[in-house]
Amino acid sequence: MTHDDRVTLPSLPRLDSLPAAEHPELVAPPVARALASWPGAAEVAVVEIDPDLADTAAMSEAYDVPMTAGGNCVVVAGSRGGDERVAACVVRADTRADVNTLVRKLLDVRKASFLPMDRAVAESGMEHGGITPLGLPDGWRVLVHDALLDEPLVVIGSGVRRSKLLVTGRLLADLPGAEVVEGLGR
């Protein structure tokens, strides 16, 4: 779908791609705020989905999206010297974040673990199953799996379960604060 003469939005068959920055009602408030201030937002599409199909495997099957085109965002935390360090890790959906080795070393903590879901939801302002790397709290690192960079289409959360954002892998690397990490997913 062409948004204007300059930008062709990413799309999925059977779903209407809309310019995400022009449809804040379809994303979580922190995501809408981030889209409003990010130059890359013009290349981001949003699609409405059945909220019961928000989990990656269900969405992938229902909408014929290959797992390699899915970007899962998990929130990991650890502490050192009383200083908590948090990172959102975006990994290709057919892999799992290497939390115990790579993420732990990147955070420079002795032990890294998934942030409890209630905290991740409360602190991000996003819904369970919809957390996305765009619009996260200040101080959270954004780690992006290098395997996603060459994907022409990556489906990520929108902050809510009833929609997804569509981006290119290249655009993920351009997210505010993004750090591309080789081998982040295994």
Language model features with spans:
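Extended, low-hydrophobicity, polar/charged segments
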Residues: 1-186
